[in-house]
């Protein structure tokens, strides 16, 4: 049985799952759909047309699904936000709804961990197992692949794509696309190395060795796109193919590789 505090506002048309807890002074808008075992803590606001998956927690004063911060937005569609299962949305996070320039929805996959004061703008698409540290700021239409981590105080420019398994260091500023499985750092951020910490959590030594060799071929000799084309023709590794296809399909470009300074 769900528990809804008397001071909370749940508008007509909202669908509330089983064993949901809605704390004092929180708000759930019309046509919102709240999954089972969700906790909405004091003062959080879930706007209309937001879907939140089972076992998620929305912490105090987070605002999910308010209108886009886009000067061209004219209420032209009934937009919203879709969040997967087991999400953690911490205090004062803001997640804006989508626009007609996308499909109308800002989307976040399963197992998201979004730390306090982070911002996810309209039409962003976040995969599964995403971590945003405090004050990470995503502009409109940003895409993050599965298992990506964005460090604190890091802004990401609109339309940037970050591939699967990347690490974006804290206090960086990202304006170009980041190849899957890489670590990027700096202002402006550039690719520095493979994200070896992330790779070791998911892959065996053989696959990591293949990706390490791929990284050297792609970034340390010749033309990046030519290298990607050549590797694509010869590799059987699905992860290498992901890296190569990403390079060939980039629209914002790949930031120039810089050797890490170990001094």
Curated annotation (Swiss-Prot):
One of its GO terms (biological process) is lipid A biosynthetic process. Its EC number is 2.3.1.129. SUPFAM superfamilies: Trimeric LpxA-like enzymes. HAMAP family: LpxA (MF_00387). Belongs to the transferase hexapeptide repeat family. LpxA subfamily. This is Acyl-[acyl-carrier-protein]--UDP-N-acetylglucosamine O-acyltransferase. Its main location: cytoplasm. Pfam families: Acetyltransf_11, Hexapep. Homotrimer. InterPro entries: Acetyltransf_C, Acetyltransf_C_sf, Hexapep, Hexapep_transf_CS, Lipid_A_LpxA, Trimer_LpxA-like_sf. Coiled coil: none annotated. Pathway: Glycolipid biosynthesis; lipid IV(A) biosynthesis; lipid IV(A) from (3R)-3-hydroxytetradecanoyl-[acyl-carrier-protein] and UDP-N-acetyl-alpha-D-glucosamine: step 1/6. The keyword Transferase applies. It catalyses: a (3R)-hydroxyacyl-[ACP] + UDP-N-acetyl-alpha-D-glucosamine = a UDP-3-O-[(3R)-3-hydroxyacyl]-N-acetyl-alpha-D-glucosamine + holo-[ACP]. Keywords: Acyltransferase, Cytoplasm, Lipid A biosynthesis, Lipid biosynthesis, Lipid metabolism, Repeat, Transferase. Involved in the biosynthesis of lipid A, a phosphorylated glycolipid that anchors the lipopolysaccharide to the outer membrane of the cell. GO terms for molecular function: acyl-[acyl-carrier-protein]-UDP-N-acetylglucosamine O-acyltransferase activity. It is found in: Cytoplasm. One of its GO terms (cellular component) is cytoplasm.
């Amino acid at each position: 049985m769900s528990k809804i505090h008397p001071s909370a506002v749940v508008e007509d048309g909202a669908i509330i799952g089983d064993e949901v807890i809605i704390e004092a002074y929180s708000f759930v808008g019309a046509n919102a759909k709240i999954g089972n075992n969700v906790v909405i803590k004091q003062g959080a606001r879930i706007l209309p047309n937001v879907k939140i998956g089972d076992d998620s927690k929305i912490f105090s004063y987070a605002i999910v699904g308010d209108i886009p911060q886009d000067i061209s937005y004219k209420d032209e569609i009934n937009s919203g936000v879709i969040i997967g299962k087991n999400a953690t949305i911490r205090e004062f996070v803001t997640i804006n709804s989508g626009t007609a320039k996308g499909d109308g929805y800002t989307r976040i996959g399963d197992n998201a961990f979004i730390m306090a004061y982070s911002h996810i703008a309209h039409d962003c698409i976040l995969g599964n197992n995403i971590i945003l540290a405090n004050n990470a700021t995503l502009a409109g239409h940003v895409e993050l692949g599965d298992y990506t981590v964005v460090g604190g105080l890091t802004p990401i420019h609109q339309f940037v794509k970050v591939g699967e398994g990347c690490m974006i260091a804290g206090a960086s500023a990202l304006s170009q696309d980041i190849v899957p499985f890489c670590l990027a750092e700096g202002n402006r951020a550039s690719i520095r190395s493979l994200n070896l910490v992330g790779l070791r959590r998911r892959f065996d030594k053989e696959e990591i060795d293949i990706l390490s060799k791929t990284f050297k071929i792609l970034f340390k000799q010749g033309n990046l796109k030519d290298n990607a084309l050549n590797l694509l023709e010869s590799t059987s590794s699905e992860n290498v193919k992901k890296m190569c296809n990403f390079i060939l399909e980039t629209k914002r470009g790949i930031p120039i590789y810089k050797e890490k300074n170990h001094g």
